[in-house]
A protein has these predicted regions:
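Short, Lys/Arg-enriched, disordered terminal segments
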Residues: 1-2
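Aromatic- and Gly/Pro-rich donor/ligand-binding loops
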Residues: 5-14, 18-137
Length: 137
């Protein structure tokens, strides 16, 4: 069985990472024979906004040493984030269907935030109607 998780895996946020890791590990425990991966779908606008928010230099708050520390933390965070297997990069529902997943897990709740920069109908399952999907929050 092949299971894919569609989430905000690219957001540099501890909560986003921990919910992704928690879902990944839970699915591995529930389906030990399954191949569990994160669907490597990235909303570029959302990613840019997130990374620029992290990397911007705040005059009066950041110093050169605190900024260097911020970059070091980002690298460490990215290393742990990438320890969870991902599919090849995909941009459309058709490309997700072409992954031939037996189950697609949509979640957690933040992917359905209509007001956030990460909104995309694909995260609601648009285009995946004929696929076996479940959602969690």
């Amino acid at each position: 069985m092949k299971i894919g998780i569609l989430t905000h895996h690219y957001v540099k946020n501890y909560g986003a990472f921990l919910q992704m890791k928690g879902m990944y590990e839970t699915l591995q425990r529930l389906y030990p024979e399954a191949e569990v991966t994160v669907i490597n779908y990235v909303n570029q606008k959302h990613w840019r906004r997130n990374i620029l928010h992290i990397l911007h230099f705040r005059p009066g708050i950041d110093t050169l040493s605190t900024y260097v520390e911020k970059i070091r933390q980002l690298r460490t965070f990215t290393k742990y984030e990438r320890s969870i297997p991902r599919t090849r990069p995909v941009k459309t529902a058709k490309e997700i269907i072409d992954l031939k997943l037996d189950l697609i897990v949509l979640g957690s709740d933040e992917i359905w935030n209509l007001c956030g920069s990460g909104y995309h109908p694909l995260k609601f399952g648009t285009g995946l109607e004929n696929q076996r999907t479940i959602a969690y929050a």
